[in-house]
C-alpha cells in the first residue's frame, strides 16, 4: 500500500512562512524524485507502478510530498501525448533528440503548466531551471529556461499577461 503524505496543507496556515516553506520544500523534493523516476522510465522502460514502488522503498520520503510525487509521475505518463504536443512548437529539436533528463524536466514542468493551475507559472519555470541545474547538462538550465519561457505564455496566457502589467 502506498503511504499518503500526512502533511496536508490548510489554507489558514498560508500566513505562516514556516509552513509555506515546509510545503514548498517537500514539493521541490517531490519534483526531484519525479524527475529521476521519469528519467528511469524513459531509459529502462519499466512500469510506472514498479518505478514508484522502488523509489518509495529506496528513498527517504519523510521530506517529500509523496502525494505530489505520485501525481507528477503518473500525470506526466497519462498526459504524455498532450504534453509532447504542447512542447514541440517550443523546441528546436525533436522530442527524440532531447537529452533524456532535460526531457523529463520539460515534461514535468509542462504537466504543471497544463494541469496544476494552482502553481504559479513563474514557480514552474524556476523549479524547472533548478532541476536542470542539478540534473541537466552544463548549460541544460539555459535550454530549459528558454523552452519554458516560450511555453508559459502559450499555456498560461492570461496569467503571464497579468504578471507583465
UniProtKB/Swiss-Prot annotation:
Basic and acidic residues: compositionally biased ranges: 10-21
GO cellular component: cytosol
Region (Disordered): 1-27
Xref: SUPFAM superfamilies: NusB-like
Keywords, in A-Z order: RNA-binding, Transcription, Transcription antitermination, Transcription regulation
Entries under Pfam families matching the protein: NusB (PF01029)
Coiled coil regions, renumbered to chain: none
Single GO MF descriptor: RNA binding
KW RNA-binding (keyword) present: yes
Matches recorded under InterPro entries: NusB-like_sf, NusB_fam, NusB_RsmB_TIM44
GO biological process: one example: DNA-templated transcription termination
Signal sequence coordinates: none
Family, per entry: Belongs to the NusB family.
Function in brief: Involved in transcription antitermination. Required for transcription of ribosomal RNA (rRNA) genes. Binds specifically to the boxA antiterminator sequence of the ribosomal RNA (rrn) operons.
Name used for this protein in its record: Transcription antitermination protein NusB
Species whose genome carries this gene: Pseudomonas syringae pv. tomato (strain ATCC BAA-871 / DC3000)
Gene from which the chain derives: nusB
Amino acid at each position: 500500500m502506498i503511504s499518503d503524505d500526512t502533511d496536508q496543507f490548510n489554507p489558514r496556515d498560508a500566513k505562516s512562512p514556516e509552513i509555506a516553506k515546509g510545503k514548498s520544500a517537500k514539493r521541490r523534493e517531490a519534483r526531484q524524485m519525479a524527475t529521476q523516476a521519469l528519467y528511469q522510465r524513459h531509459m529502462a522502460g519499466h512500469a510506472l507502478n514498479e518505478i514508484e514502488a522502488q523509489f518509495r522503498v529506496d528513498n527517504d520520503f519523510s521530506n517529500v510530498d509523496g502525494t505530489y510525487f505520485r501525481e507528477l509521475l503518473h500525470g506526466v505518463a497519462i498526459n504524455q501525448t498532450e504534453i509532447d504536443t504542447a512542447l514541440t512548437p517550443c523546441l528546436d529539436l525533436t522530442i527524440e533528440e532531447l537529452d533524456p533528463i532535460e526531457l523529463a524536466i520539460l515534461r514535468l514542468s509542462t504537466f504543471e503548466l497544463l494541469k496544476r493551475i494552482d502553481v504559479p507559472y513563474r514557480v514552474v519555470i524556476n523549479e524547472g531551471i533548478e532541476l536542470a541545474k542539478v540534473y541537466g547538462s552544463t548549460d541544460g538550465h539555459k535550454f530549459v529556461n528558454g523552452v519554458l519561457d516560450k511555453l508559459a505564455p502559450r499555456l498560461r496566457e492570461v496569467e503571464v499577461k497579468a504578471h507583465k502589467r
